[in-house]
Amino acid sequence: MSDEEEVYSDEEVEEEEVEETEEAPAEAEEPEETTEEVVAPPEVKERRAPVQEEKPPAEMTEAEIAMLAAKKRHEEEEAAKLLDYEQRRVLEKEQIEQELRELKEKQEKRRAEREEDERQFAERRRQDDERRRKEEDERKAKADAEKIRKNEEKVRRQQMMAGAFNGRVEAGAGRNFTVASKGDQAAQFGNLAQAKGGKDVMSKEQMEDAKRNFLAAVCRVQDVSGLLPNDLKERIRGLHARIVKLEAEKYDLEKRRERQDYDMKELHERQRQAARNKALKKGLDPEEAASSVHPPKITTASKFDRQTDRRSYGDRRYLFENPEEEKQASLVRGTGRPPAEWGRKQNEELEQIRKNLEPPKYVEQVKVEGARAPVEPVPLFVPTDDFEPQQVTEDPNVGEEVVVE
């Protein structure tokens, strides 16, 4: 036997062993298939090509043996490829399932975290709203208490000041001041001399005495000889609180004075600028108007309510003593009829209307003997001047009456 036949015989032996190992699990799976076939409906089996019976190796030629070996080798390669592909498919499927499982777990975890975050955010928001509401209530209560305390302090200070000047303030005694009427105040302060000599105006010495009395009433000597240590501490705390409050009031008053000074300066500057602009409009010296020590003139009446008379006193006095007499217009004298063109407009349309509207003139057919006019005829006289040289005292329309017999 040659070397090739020995190789082929060894390969055939190996192929037979592999076929036996493959047939063993196939036989083991056959009972399961039979059990499944009992339950499952009958299936149509496909026809397969008839299996050709292999010849024994002794009857095969070398070419057939080589072809058979190549065929078996090809089948083994295909089986190995199929097994490798199935294994890869199983691994890929397991990997995909694992990834899907991990994604679902992550999704569930994120959903739980989001729900937890929303719950915590809602809880924090509720706590913030409640805290803000409490702070607002506390702020309002504190503001109300501070307002009440300030009002009480103001009333107490007013009572203390009134008691320092007037001895003491009785409860329900009414107001401790008097309001002067407007007429009395105007009569008292009509001018500076009366204002200085008024009885209600305090002099400098009186103001100093009032100040000393007030300080003596406020700054009384405290008797601490019979006080216990705790009472002395309370008294010290009270004095310290009062000093702090007085310093705060002093600071507020100083700032208020500064603001008032600033406002006064600003108003004064505005007044100067207004006087300067007014002087420029009138053609006067702006520097003199702005730096004048006299206050600006205040117009008590509107310039639209009356006409401003800019004439001097001498002119007005002369006009008052010699009033201007109205001249009388010139009169046309005579009994003649005035010319037709007086007061008539030359217009063809108007002339045509007049011709149509005027009644026919009366023409005397038979003359009456001895007929005269009711008045003596006076020749027509048209003056050339617009006004009469002398005042006319007689009525020009009144003439001598003529009796008609």
UniProtKB/Swiss-Prot annotation:
It comes from the Eukaryota. Residues 1-77, 100-156, 262-359, 377-405 are annotated as: Disordered. Pfam families: Troponin. InterPro entries: TNNT, Troponin, Troponin_sf. One of its GO terms (cellular component) is troponin complex. GO terms for molecular function: tropomyosin binding. Residues 43-57, 262-272, 303-319, 342-358 have a biased composition (Basic and acidic residues). Residues 1-36 have a biased composition (Acidic residues). One of its GO terms (biological process) is embryonic morphogenesis. Belongs to the troponin T family. Troponin T is the tropomyosin-binding subunit of troponin, the thin filament regulatory complex which confers calcium-sensitivity to muscle actomyosin ATPase activity. This is Troponin T. It comes from Caenorhabditis elegans. The lineage of its organism: Eukaryota, Metazoa, Ecdysozoa, Nematoda, Chromadorea.
